């Protein structure tokens, strides 16, 4: 089994953690933006079927 030879420094660990958090926050922002555009009907990437009223 692979074992690291030396301990990872605190600064390197913090940098990697911030990159990981940044990717998550970016994905959440994109998901929120897509949800907003779908709810307002301004989405250009999704086609949502409109319900037809029979009355």
Swiss-Prot record:
GO BP, one annotated term: translation
Keyword list, A-Z: Chloroplast, Plastid, Ribonucleoprotein, Ribosomal protein
Coiled-coil ranges per UniProt: none
SUPFAM superfamilies hit by this protein: Zn-binding ribosomal proteins
Transmembrane regions: none
Subcellular location: Plastid, Chloroplast
Top-level taxon: Eukaryota
This protein's GO CC annotations: chloroplast; large ribosomal subunit
Molecular function in Gene Ontology: structural constituent of ribosome
Alphabetized Pfam families for the sequence: Ribosomal_L32p
PANTHER family: 50S RIBOSOMAL PROTEIN L32, CHLOROPLASTIC, LARGE RIBOSOMAL SUBUNIT PROTEIN BL32C
Family: Belongs to the bacterial ribosomal protein bL32 family.
Protein name: Large ribosomal subunit protein bL32c
Gene (name only): rpl32
């Amino acid at each position: 089994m692979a074992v690291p030879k030396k301990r990872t420094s605190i600064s390197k660990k913090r940098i990697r953690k911030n990159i990981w958090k940044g990717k998550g926050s970016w994905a959440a922002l994109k998901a929120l933006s897509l949800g907003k555009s779908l709810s307002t009907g301004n989405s250009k990437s999704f086609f949502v079927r409109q319900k037809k009223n029979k009355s």
